[in-house]
Swiss-Prot record:
Organism of origin: Pectobacterium carotovorum subsp. carotovorum (strain PC1)
Protein known as: UPF0178 protein PC1_0756
Cited CDD domains: PIN_YqxD-like
One Pfam short name: DUF188
InterPro entries: UPF0178 (IPR003791)
NCBIfam families xrefs: PRK00124.1
Family (UniProt): Belongs to the UPF0178 family.
PANTHER family hit by this protein: UPF0178 PROTEIN YAII
């Protein structure tokens, strides 16, 4: 059981939460990115640099994730693939994707893509709030607690 991070788009404040959790719970955290990511020295934290390109990091995460692993990502198609493989997916705002919610999220994403393609401005997500950070930390702790149960 380990945590994979879609690190190119993951906010630094969320990475910091993950770094602390990795050491506190002795859980392996791997940040996958197409650029160099600075991480604190720890035997529980590592980086995996992939080549640049569309979905290269996502594809590497899907290739390596195993049932029971957790993936941190805001990428809904990646989260869907992780869930399909028996993993768990959590976004940086603390929303845990489930088999039931991921289908709805994929449909909404496709709808918004269609709207943007037709020229309608849809705007982006709001800035990460303190509440979002707390929600993320809470959901991460829940997952870690469940994963460590014998």
């Amino acid at each position: 059981m380990q945590i994979w991070v879609d690190a190119d788009a993951c906010p630094n404040v969320i990475k910091d939460v993950l770094f602390r959790a990795a050491d506190r719970t002795q859980t392996q955290v791997t940040l996958v990115a197409n650029q160099t990511i600075k991480v604190p020295p720890s035997r529980f934290i590592r980086t995996l640099r992939v080549s640049s390109g569309f979905d290269v990091a996502d594809n590497e995460i899907v290739r390596r994730v195993e049932a029971g692993d957790l993936v941190i990502t805001a990428d809904i198609p990646l989260a869907a693939e992780v869930i399909e493989k028996g993993g768990a997916a959590l976004n940086p705002r603390g929303e845990r994707y489930t088999p039931d919610t991921i289908r709805e999220r994929l449909n909404m994403r496709d709808f918004m893509d269609t709207m943007r393609a037709s020229g309608i401005q849809t705007g982006g997500p709001s800035a990460l709030s303190q509440r979002d950070r707390q929600q993320f930390a809470n959901e991460l702790d829940k997952w870690l607690h469940q994963a460590k149960k014998p």
